[in-house]
Amino acid sequence: MNTPETFDFKFYEWEEKFRDKPFLKQPFGDEWEIYTWGEVGQYARKLATGLRSLGLRENAHIGLISKNCREWIIADLAIVMAGYISVPFFPNLTSGEINTLLTFGDVDLLFAGKVEDWEEQKAGVPEGMPIISFPTYKGCSDITEGHQWFDFINQHEPLQEPHKPKLSDVWTIIFTSGTTGNPKGVVLDYLANQSTAELTLDTNALKIDFNGNNTFFSYLPLNHIAERVVVEYAVFRFGGTLSFAENLDTFAKNLQETQPTVFFAVPRIWTKFQMGILSKIPQEKLSKLLKIPVLSWILKRKFNKALGLSKARSIVS
């Protein structure tokens, strides 16, 4: 049995406890497709078996290029189960940037998914590198190279004995954006995650429900360490559901339907929210209304409900 120190151990606990409860929620137009904790566990185990069948080296580096989606989470979990190291990238890289990072990251296999210009990007993938492609999403590229997601998963049985990482093992390599020069890979071990978990448990600054009653919404790039820890790692570690935005046009609708209990945002998102509010109420009038305590309280509640934040216990920026 693994020690209760790495996030995969907690995933197995939630999987057992919440086997038939919703975990990953993916929007498709007006509909949401839901994977339960049990289904995600089975998909990840089958994928892990498939990865091991490819004869990769020990501690192989597995690249991942895709916008946020359920397959991203399953692939990341399978990489851990198989005993490999994830190397995620921004989904909008050019072919030259992809080639550079695949080389710097010493990547052995690439998951390619929800991207918009694969025809240009694939030129940066070294010849002969194995590829596993996600299902095609509306508005994104149809990737026909390599192993197809469901075909590959369904060829394999669930991995019976997933890898049991130690705190000192490398978990992931996160590349910087490279805006100030060549991108640099930051190597993180499982201890980094455990330290975050301990801090959350001690302070509960995120107002997490430790019984698994949490709702997360993922839209910022998962290859960025902040989204990876505050959203992906948090749901693995503390339980709940994780929903995604379908695209930029549906962001507001998807957020409103999700009503997350923990919401992580960057300044440009707040600017977008502000512009939406000011398009309905002029700044001068809004400022006057917010100075009246009762009206201020009512307006803030209405704004939060309209934005999809009425159930948010914690808003992080």
Q: PLM features: residue spans?
A:
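A short N-terminal helical cap/helix-turn-helix that marks the beginning
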Residues: 2-23, 42
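Conserved pre-ATP/AMP-binding loop-to-beta segment of ANL
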Residues: 22, 154-175, 182, 208-215
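Conserved AMP-binding/adenylate-forming core of the ANL superfamily
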Residues: 23-69, 73, 77, 94-99, ...
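Conserved AMP-binding A3 loop
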Residues: 34-38, 171-197
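Structural core segment of the AMP-binding/adenylate-forming
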Residues: 54, 77, 81-151
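A short helix-loop-beta submotif of the ANL/AMP-binding
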Residues: 61, 67-87, 91-95, 103-109, ...
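ANL superfamily adenylate-forming
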Residues: 116-167, 277-306
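Conserved AMP-binding/adenylation subdomain of ANL enzymes
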Residues: 194-218, 222-311
